Amino acid sequence: VIKLDKPIVAFEDAEDGREDKAPRKIIRLADEREVQIKVAFSMVSIEGAKKNLNLELEHWDFDTVRKEAENKWENYLSRIEIEGTDEQKINFYTALYHLLIQPNNVADVNGQYKNAKDSVLLSPFGIYYSTFSLWDTYRAAHPLYTILTPELLPDMVNSMLLHAECQGYLPIWTLWGKETHCMIGNHAVPVIVEACLKNFPGIDVEQAYHLIKKSLTVSHFKYDVEAYDRYGYFPFDIVEE
């Protein structure tokens, strides 16, 4: 959903000879010198996107939005202070910024989300995290989340458990709530186990154990238990990488 602070006087097809799958449009405004645009997404519905837009950003004060974003980032980036040269600080805080741009809450403001099977559900905790690049992040990023952003950990883990309840095994590499199956293995396991061993609140340890055991002992796409038990690894001619 897109909303502008200037009236639209014309909405035309872009005739540039390109054959894109999505239609390309040209918007004509009464005053084209300066325009502010709000954009909102929803994985559930257009109505959901409208609600997200209206509740998450009610005003048109650009400077206020910029300051609010600055304050939010300052809250997270200031949790670690380092000493060094300006270049070293730039490199470090850029890496810290990259750490914090995912995972993403893909639920609407009302807590609705689409699960791995495209069913619309209501998150029991109002949030549903996705963009779990777990084979990249289980080694260092997720352990750092337990130290740097502990308030976010239970919702991350519970999102993984919701995903596993739906598709039958823990997430491999999720994007917009769907499984991409990028890479083999079960890298969600150490992430969940660490959170449980560190006694993060709000996590059902028995449920976590059940889903971990099921993910490790029941074959699923790119995970052949019999092949692994026989060879101790996944042969490329038996298990697709």
Predicted regions and their residues:
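A conserved hydrophobic secondary-structure block that centers on an alpha-helix together
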Residues: E19-D20, S130-T131, A141-H142, P150-P154, ...
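Stable alpha-helical elements in mature extracytoplasmic
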Residues: A69, D136, L152-M156, A188, ...
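Secondary-structure capping and boundary motifs in well-ordered enzyme cores
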Residues: E87-Q88, I127-D136, H181-A188
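A general alpha-helix detector
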Residues: N52, K72, Y76, T137-R139, ...
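Flexible glycine/proline-enriched surface loops and loop-helix/loop-strand junctions
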Residues: S123-G126, T137, A141, W176, ...
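Acidic/polar, glycine-enriched structural segments that form the non-catalytic walls/loops
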Residues: V1-Y128, L162, Y169-I172, G202-F221
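Alpha-helical support elements that line or immediately flank enzyme active sites
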Residues: T94-A107, S130-L153, V193-N199
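Active-site lining segments of carbohydrate-active enzymes
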Residues: T180, I184-E241
